[in-house]
């Protein structure tokens, strides 16, 4: 009996070892390090314009590797300059080369410290958004991601993107973009991803660029500091006929101790958000409302005890 028990344990260990080897093999396929460094492809220079004067931008002092600009600057006749740092285009003064922090550790800490219900809500919302995006023909389309962060959304859909679309990831945190770029550089197959570090109102893109607008809480994050509804400010960047896939942080109620000042609260209400989407002439294809949440993680310090939040997700289209 003892011998049979030991044999069974050996068999179990071998099965676990096989599973582990298979998992590691899958991981190595997905994260196989490529020699190519992602930069700004020479073929996409025509999508840029100066955010100050709308002038065309010219490449100066460029270091180019396999058709990708990895260092250098784009300059405008008005004197505005856009530095390219490690393949990321920067605009305005908000993008400083912050001292690199270990975002991998931060993500791990965040997952362990965040309320399970909140994480499940993030995951469900992400899967819903992915399903909606996959319903569209993305061939030769430009996708504009407003507030890409560390790329939870992009990494979830990366393999599904066709090789001939352009995905533009915009964030004002250079560290997060460099981290995301490093992750993407390890992925196969290769996709056309453009990284821009800029405040939302300083995005140096031509008008009518975006075929598909991805706004996974970018507007909500902007609303913590600004009364204007972000998508109205950026509407000139969207094509008259385009799709939008968005998610908004909404409050069920506000506490007297709320961190959201009274003048900014309207942008966190369902009626306001839905009304603004209507004003932009987007028609609903599908929508989703999450459960109410009482707790978040260490980065969700925008709501206090007694307040409940939820997310409203929207998928829609407008016809020019």
Language-model features and meaning:
Residues 228-243:
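A short glycine-rich, Lys/Arg-flanked "PGG" loop and its adjoining helix->strand segment in the class I
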Residues 201-213:
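A short acidic, Gly/Pro-enriched loop at the edge of an enzyme's catalytic core
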Residues 243-268:
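Conserved class I S-adenosyl-L-methionine
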Residues 98-126:
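Class I SAM-dependent methyltransferase Rossmann-like catalytic core
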Residues 144, 150-202:
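Class I SAM-dependent methyltransferase SAM/SAH-binding core
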Residues 265-281, 286-287:
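Short alpha-helix
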Residues 211-226:
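A short SAM/SAH-binding and catalytic strip from SAM-dependent methyltransferases
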Residues 120-140, 156:
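Conserved alpha-helix/loop element of class I SAM-dependent methyltransferases that forms part
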């Amino acid at each position: 009996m003892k011998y049979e028990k030991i044999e069974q344990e050996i068999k179990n260990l071998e099965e676990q070892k096989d599973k582990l080897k298979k998992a590691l093999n899958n991981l190595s396929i997905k994260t196989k390090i490529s020699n190519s460094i992602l930069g700004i492809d020479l073929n996409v220079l025509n999508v840029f314009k100066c955010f100050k004067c709308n002038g065309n931008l010219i490449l100066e002092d460029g270091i180019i590797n396999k058709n990708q600009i990895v260092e250098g600057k784009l300059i405008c006749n008005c004197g505005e300059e856009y530095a390219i740092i490690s393949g990321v285009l920067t605009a305005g003064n908000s993008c400083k080369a912050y001292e690199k922090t270990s975002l991998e550790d931060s993500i791990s800490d965040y997952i362990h410290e965040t309320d399970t219900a909140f994480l499940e809500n993030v995951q469900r919302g992400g899967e819903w958004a992915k399903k909606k995006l996959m319903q569209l023909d993305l061939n030769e389309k430009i996708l504009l991601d407003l507030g890409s962060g560390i790329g939870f959304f992009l990494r979830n859909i990366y393999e599904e993107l066709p090789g001939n679309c352009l995905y533009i990831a915009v964030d004002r945190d250079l560290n997060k973009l460099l981290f995301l770029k490093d992750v993407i550089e390890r992925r196969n197959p290769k996709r056309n991803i453009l990284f821009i570090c800029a405040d939302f109102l300083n995005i140096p893109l031509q008008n009518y660029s975006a075929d598909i607008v991805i706004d996974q809480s970018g507007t909500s994050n902007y609303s913590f500091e600004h009364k204007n509804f972000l998508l109205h400010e950026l509407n000139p960047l969207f094509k008259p006929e385009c799709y939008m896939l968005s998610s908004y942080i909404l409050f069920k109620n506000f506490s007297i101790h709320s961190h959201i000042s009274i003048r900014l609260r309207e942008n966190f209400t369902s009626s306001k958000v839905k009304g603004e989407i209507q004003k932009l002439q987007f028609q609903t294809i599908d929508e989703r409302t999450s459960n109410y949440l009482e707790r978040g993680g260490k980065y969700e310090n925008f709501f206090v005890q007694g307040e409940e939040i939820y997310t409203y997700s929207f998928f829609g289209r407008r016809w020019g």
